[in-house]
Amino acid sequence: MLISRYTGIPILKDTLYAHPYEAVGEFQFDDSVVAVFPDMIQRSVPGYQTILTGIGELTAKYAQPNSQLYDLGCSLGAATLTMRRKAPQGSQIIAVDTSQPMIERAKEHIEGFHSDIPVRLLCDDMTQIPIENASVVVINFTLQFIEPSARQVLLDKIYQGLKPGGILILSEKIHFESAELQEAIEHLQLQFKRANGYSELEISQKRASLENVLISDSEATHLNRLQQSGFKAANIWFQAYNFASFLAIKA
């Protein structure tokens, strides 16, 4: 069994869509997904480990003592653990996910690593929790799963809850306004999945399961939202194919 060197999480192979289904249901973060999630995301998202490393380095630079750090949509706690390694004394991390199986497994993983930085795990909707006294907020590939109409409101709340000098790290699958670019870059991402061992059946069934669940935005839409929230400095700091991570800094 492989173990992630970033999180210590056991990596079980993702075979959820390896067998044909008569009808593919909507993707859910249930027990079956939790069991294979580290393998799923590493084989599906190019640059994922680089983003985790960057989250740690940005936490080291921008996290403020006696402040709160948020991981909104924490899944198994990979970003939480990365942040905690770099967080200053006196800070605490609030990690939130709507999936109870994710929260339960995240608790096991986080408790497996000693740290003086406390982590508060919440099974809740990120759009409903208060953001207060924050110096770092991370949304790592989870904004795309909430209703588009709720996204601006959430970013507004995050901006208001950030301390001056605080940051938002927002990682998302993006789409392109140009149909030609969309086709070309999507081809590269599909080739990445094929190279990582996913079959055509797995790729097609996974895509069908996500069709009405993951709703992506363009780079321009993300940047416009961030600007509308009040961020004066915001841009992509990392991109691999159609996966991008934005950094927004509150003045």
Curated annotation (Swiss-Prot):
Gene3D superfamilies: Vaccinia Virus protein VP39. Keywords: S-adenosyl-L-methionine, Transferase. It catalyses: prephenate + S-adenosyl-L-methionine = carboxy-S-adenosyl-L-methionine + 3-phenylpyruvate + H2O. The keyword Ribosomal protein does not apply. Its EC number is 2.1.3.-. S-adenosyl-L-methionine binds at residues 48, 73-75, 140, 207. InterPro entries: CmoA, Methyltransf_25, SAM-dependent_MTases_sf. One of its GO terms (molecular function) is S-adenosyl-L-methionine binding. GO terms for biological process: tRNA wobble uridine modification. Transmembrane segments: none annotated. It comes from the Bacteria. HAMAP family: Cx_SAM_synthase (MF_01589). Belongs to the class I-like SAM-binding methyltransferase superfamily. Cx-SAM synthase family. Catalyzes the conversion of S-adenosyl-L-methionine (SAM) to carboxy-S-adenosyl-L-methionine (Cx-SAM). Homodimer. This is Carboxy-S-adenosyl-L-methionine synthase. It comes from Hydrogenovibrio crunogenus (strain DSM 25203 / XCL-2). The lineage of its organism: Bacteria, Pseudomonadati, Pseudomonadota, Gammaproteobacteria, Thiotrichales.
